[in-house]
Each structure stands twice: as structure tokens, then as C-alpha cells.
């Protein structure tokens, strides 16, 4: 149970997670295609790749990038092909030496107990997997057989090393750690220190920390140059703030990351009406750091489209002090509350600061103050008489 420091009146908290109840839940218009999905996957399809042989120049990375069924199928076929190949070699050695001839031979065979291709295949498996049943063995009669034995052992060790390394890299990939790095479903634009700010919340569900965590943000939109060139995915970096300055964050508890919308911001001319009609705006957020337990660099990504940005709302507090420690209520991670915010662009607010003064005056006379006065004048429903205490 959280302390009273984290309690907010229920009528000022949205019942649906970071969603405007005045807007329809389902939109009929077509949404803009995402460049980065909410889970961090890049929505890009590569087509007509001519030089596909470049993928074979880095076989290990190609195997790691493949899906599990494809990777397991490749290693299974590698073992089967190597066993069959060396089984054919052992059968040819026995055939050339005359070990497959019927009857009792007086000559010492190259490999004992090989009488057919099946026995040669079993011997190939015993050599490469080092089972060592003992029924078949290489003799000193054929130096070529000794050389093939050495080569097959080396090939088997190489396949095992590549398979174990690939499986380890696939199970310890950085995106596994990113599954517990969460972002708020919606972003908000509201006032902070008299300036319009773009805000989002980020948190880490694990107790193991992300070392040297940094956060970056980019605005992706369709633009046209003065020469008439259309750039469908024009990326612009914008600075983020976390309360202490810089992009580095100490992610021991959920943080609200914000960007001050100033004259250098690509959101300087963004108005509330653009959030419902602006189809070419996408804000990508990238959180990167080193996993404390494994030392592997991980990266978590998400994006916000125009209709996923809430104007005039603020994230509710979720960190409260309780019993000498801080507790985090993740059930309110994406909850927002409406706050007075000017319905104009940041440029208009900078040019006319009287809009902010009028907003401050209107908020001081708002229903929130009247409600607090009414609550203060309300009489308690229960009273304790002095006689009951004696």
C-alpha cells in the first residue's frame, strides 16, 4: 500500500491508460506507417538485394540472426552431411584395401569390423561424437586412415564450437534484456517552468541496473527540400532532459524524460490540432546502456505517432516513500492527469507571453480550487465526544 503522498483524486485520473475520453476509441482514418514499432522493431522490408553473397562472408552473424528453427535445421544437416561424407571416405578406404571382400582375410584391415556402408556410417558417428563403443578401431595398416581420423575430429570440433557459440549468442542477445525496459504508451505535451515540453516516462522492471544508460530522441517526418527533393524519412536529433541535464540517466526508478520545445526544436510549430491531422510525424526514443550482470550492450526502442501524443496532460506520480524506502506503483505507469496548458504552438507562446499569464489566472479560478474550498468547509460525518475518551 502506498502512502498518502502518492494519492491523487480519482476524478482527475483517466480511467483508460493515457487515453483522452473525449476522442473516439476507434479511428476510421488510416494511420501513418510506423518506422519503429512500439516494441522497438524496425518496420523496414529489404527487397531486390542483388549481392546476397555478402551474407555468407559473415556466416556466424548470419546464423545468429536466423530464427531458431532455421538455425537448428542447419546444424542438424551439418552433422548428418559430415557423418555421411566421412562414412563414404571410410567405406572407400575399406574397399580399396580389400576389407569388404567376403571370406576370411589374412591381411590386417585398415578399420576393424567394417563390412558395409552401414558399419562405415556407424564408425563415422563414433569417431566424430567420440562415443567409443570399442567394436571398431583404426589400425596401423593404413596411414591414410590415421590422417582421415585426425581430419574428422577437427571438423567435428569446429562444428561443435560454432554451434555452441551460436546458441550462446542467441540466448544472450541484448534485446532479451530490453524486454523489461518499458516506455509509457503515450507521450504528453505540457508546461514545465513556463515552457512547453514533450514528456515521456521510462522504467526498468528488473533490480539489476543498466550501467551508463543514455537516451536519445529523433523526429522522423516527410519533408521537401527547397530544390523539390522529397525526403520520406527525414531524421532530426533533438536533445532530451532528465532533470539533471545531459542524456545520461540513473534508471533505478521510473523517470520522466522531457524535451524543451524551443526555437531549435522541430516541434516548435506543432499545434494541438496537428496531433489529430498530422500524418507525417513520428518521434523515436532510443534507450541504450550496458547490462550489469552480463556486460552486454542493450538497446530499447519505441516510437510515438502524432495521435499518441496527449496535449495538456501530465504523468501522475508513482514513486512514494513508505516505511523508510521508496515504492513504485507500476499500475499507474501510464496514467495521466489533465493540467492547464495553452492551446497554441511554442512559437506563439514565446511571442505572446500574456497567454501564459492568462492561463495562470484562469487556473487559479478553476474548479479545482472551488472543490478544495468546498471540501474544507464540509463537516465531518463522525465526531468523538469527550465522554467517550474518559
Swiss-Prot record:
K(+) 2 binds at residue 133. The keyword Nucleotide-binding applies. Gene3D superfamilies: 1.10.287.70, G protein-activated inward rectifier potassium channel 1. The chain crosses the membrane at residues 67-89, 143-167. The modification Phosphothreonine is found at residue 341. There are two PtdIns(4,5)P2 binding sites: A canonical site where the phosphate groups of one PtdIns(4,5)P2 molecule are coordinated at least by residues Lys-67, Trp-68 and Arg-176; a non-canonical site where the second PtdIns(4,5)P2 molecule is coordinated by both KCNJ11 and ABCC8/SUR1 residues. This is ATP-sensitive inward rectifier potassium channel 11.
Amino acid at each position: 500500500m502506498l502512502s498518502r503522498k502518492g494519492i491523487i483524486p480519482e476524478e482527475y485520473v483517466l480511467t483508460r491508460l493515457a487515453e483522452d475520453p473525449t476522442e473516439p476509441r476507434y479511428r476510421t482514418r488510416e494511420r501513418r506507417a510506423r518506422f519503429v514499432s512500439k516494441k522497438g522493431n524496425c518496420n523496414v522490408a529489404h527487397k531486390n538485394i542483388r549481392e546476397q553473397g555478402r551474407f555468407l562472408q559473415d556466416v556466424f552473424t548470419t546464423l545468429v540472426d536466423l530464427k531458431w528453427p532455421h538455425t537448428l535445421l542447419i546444424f542438424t544437416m551439418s552433422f548428418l552431411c559430415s557423418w555421411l561424407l566421412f562414412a563414404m571416405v571410410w567405406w572407400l578406404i575399406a574397399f580399396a584395401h580389400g576389407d569388404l571382400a567376403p571370406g576370411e582375410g589374412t591381411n590386417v584391415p585398415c578399420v576393424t569390423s567394417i563390412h558395409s556402408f552401414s558399419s562405415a556410417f556407424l564408425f563415422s558417428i563414433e569417431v566424430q561424437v567420440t562415443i567409443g563403443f570399442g567394436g571398431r578401431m583404426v589400425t596401423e595398416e593404413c596411414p591414410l586412415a590415421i590422417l582421415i581420423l585426425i581430419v574428422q575430429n577437427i571438423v567435428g570440433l569446429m562444428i561443435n564450437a560454432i554451434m555452441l557459440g551460436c546458441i550462446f549468442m542467441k540466448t544472450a542477445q541484448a534485446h532479451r534484456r530490453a524486454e523489461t525496459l518499458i516506455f509509457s504508451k503515450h507521450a504528453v505535451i505540457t508546461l514545465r517552468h513556463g515552457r512547453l515540453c514533450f514528456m515521456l516516462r521510462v522504467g526498468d522492471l528488473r533490480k539489476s541496473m543498466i550501467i551508463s544508460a543514455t537516451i536519445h530522441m529523433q523526429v522522423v517526418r516527410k519533408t521537401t527540400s527547397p530544390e523539390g527533393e522529397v525526403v520520406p524519412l527525414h531524421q532530426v536529433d533533438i536533445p532530451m532532459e532528465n532533470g539533471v541535464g545531459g542524456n545520461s540517466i540513473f534508471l533505478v526508478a521510473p523517470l520522466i524524460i522531457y524535451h524543451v520545445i524551443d526555437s531549435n526544436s522541430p516541434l516548435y510549430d506543432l499545434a494541438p490540432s496537428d496531433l489529430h491531422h498530422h500524418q507525417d510525424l513520428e518521434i523515436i526514443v532510443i534507450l541504450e546502456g550496458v547490462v550489469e550482470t552480463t556486460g552486454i550492450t542493450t538497446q530499447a526502442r519505441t516510437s510515438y505517432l502524432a495521435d499518441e501524443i496527449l496535449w495538456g496532460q501530465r504523468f501522475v506520480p508513482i514513486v512514494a516513500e513508505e516505511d523508510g524506502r521508496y515504492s513504485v506503483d507500476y499500475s499507474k505507469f501510464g496514467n495521466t492527469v489533465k493540467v492547464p496548458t495553452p492551446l497554441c504552438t511554442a512559437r506563439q507562446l514565446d511571442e505572446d507571453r500574456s497567454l501564459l499569464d492568462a492561463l495562470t489566472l484562469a487556473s487559479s479560478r478553476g474548479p479545482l480550487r472551488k472543490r478544495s474550498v468546498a471540501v474544507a468547509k464540509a463537516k465531518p460525518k463522525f465526531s468523538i465526544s469527550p465522554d467517550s475518551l474518559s
